[in-house]
Amino acid sequence: MEMFCYQCQETLRNEACVAQGVCGKSPETANLQDLLIYVLKGISYWANKARELNVEDESVDLFVAEGLFVTITNVNFDEGRIVEYIDEAVDKRRIIENKFKEVYEKKYNEKFQEKVPDAAVWNPKDNNEDEYLNKAVEVGVLSESDEDIRSLKNFLVIGLKGVAAYTDHAYILKHSNDDILAFIEKALAETLREDITVDELMNLVLKIGEYGVNAMALLDEANTSTFGNPEITQVYTGTYETPAILVSGHDLLDLYEILEQTKGKGIKVYTHGEMLPANAYPGLKKYEHLAGNFGGSWWKQQQEFEDFGGAVVMTTNCIQKPRNSYKDRIFTTGLVGWPDVQHIPNRKKDGQKDFTPVIQKALEIGPIKKREGKAITIGFAHEQTAQVADKIVEAVKSGKITKFYVMGGCDGRNKDREYYTNFAKDLPKSAVILTAGCAKYRYNMLDLGDIDGIPRVIDAGQCNDSYSLVLTALKLKEAFDLKDINELPIEYNIAWYEQKAVTVLLSLLYMGVKGIRLGPTLPAFLSPNVLETVAKTFDIKTI
């Protein structure tokens, strides 16, 4: 079986993965994910119709966001679970369709007669994987013949995946926004239109930027209202000789529950990858057994998890194929999945997840090896940065800071990403890097020093904390009484890998930022015509 996937930066030859995903995704998993997205579009068709009659179902809307999140790179490689999501998607679609038709018939005293797209009515006969795979071949990426329409439809879906991920994270912390969910469904439903134009699709793609900002703001509010505003924090990168759990991914609530359940058990907990910023939240750093951060970005995990020696928990995306050396001590939870890896089930209403299997494994393994480390400085989210804004402004006015470089985004395996390390090393000592996301691991261990106590690497947090970088830029614009954000002494050198980074890019464009340098390559899902339009309109370049 073949596949066609070009949603990430590492897609084969910067064209598409067709035999096997560079990420490790099988053709079967890729095709099942295509079908899941197809059914999500069908749900969205009915949800939009229902919303026109003031009929809503939050469980359906949230499922659409969750379903998109499942298809993000490195989230779920478990075919069986993708099949379960498709089963549930068909059920959710039926629920919202019936709700709509019931109200429609009462209001108009007649049955709904409009022509309905196949995604909204396709019903499997056998509900098995073979049937799903056969259907997936019909509805995958290449089912759209027009190159530019295909490019824009996929650009749209890829951007929506990031919005969906941030929205889902916020919902886990009891924060939701109906307008964001409604936009996701409206945009998905629009991709089913046979008469949609290039201009209409381009406008929808750019609209993602607005909702990307809204979703990041929602998640920021969820995180900070739950765990407090991040504080400037020194994080240790070594390990201690005790039983240990390493927590990777993005889900702060999972980390909190692990910390709660390991209190008094002699276990030290470490963050990994995108979980590093958790060490700066008051509600998490208060736990004395949160010992620091081990390792770097996601793509080094196979060696790092093997070396770590303790139990490992993957809370969101960024999982790679586990090596046999640690497969019996790695656990997934939430939307993450890998075949034959033990999964921690979701929490029941108002309860916690039960991380007992992880804790037992850590205790069974016993103490891990002691390693010396160094301290790195984190915690410069927008609230903390605002508290030192006067100092930053004064340093700019005095000429001690001459330029800021926003170097947020994702890290990855591509050797060309060494460019970002060299770029950081070669910056003048009067330059300051503003970063968020795992791209930071290319330079956050360098000894770049500080300027009057201001670190030359200002780390705002996870990829969603790019929102903090935007707020910081807007505050600087206000402080210098400028009319345009592009008048600031800021350059944008963004590294992308997966779909959330595309959402961040569109959010920056929405905020009016121009002249972004995007790398290490430009997205394969952009056709030549679409790429030319976007590059010319927003002055986007590559490295």
From Swiss-Prot:
GO terms for MF: 4 iron, 4 sulfur cluster binding; hydroxylamine reductase activity; metal ion binding; peroxidase activity
Ligand binding ([4Fe-4S] cluster): 5, 8, 17, 23
Gene Ontology, cellular component aspect: cytoplasm
GO biological process: response to hydrogen peroxide
Reaction catalysis annotation: A + NH4(+) + H2O = hydroxylamine + AH2 + H(+)
Claim: Metal-binding is one of the keywords in the record: yes
Obligatory cofactor(s): [4Fe-4S] cluster; hybrid [4Fe-2O-2S] cluster
Annotated InterPro entries: HCP/CODH, Hydroxylam_reduct, Prismane-like_a/b-sand, Prismane-like_sf, Prismane_a-bundle
Root EC class: oxidoreductase
Cofactor stoichiometry and binding remark: Binds 1 [4Fe-4S] cluster.
Subcellular location: Cytoplasm
Record carries keyword Transit peptide: no
Modified residues (Cysteine persulfide): 410
EC numbers, comma separated: 1.7.99.1
Pfam families associated with the record: Prismane
Residues at which hybrid [4Fe-2O-2S] cluster binds: 250, 274, 318, 410, 438, 463, 498, 500
Keywords for this protein: 4Fe-4S, Cytoplasm, Iron, Iron-sulfur, Metal-binding, Oxidoreductase
Protein family membership: Belongs to the HCP family.
Functional note: Catalyzes the reduction of hydroxylamine to form NH(3) and H(2)O.
UniProt name for this protein: Hydroxylamine reductase
Organism: Petrotoga mobilis (strain DSM 10674 / SJ95)
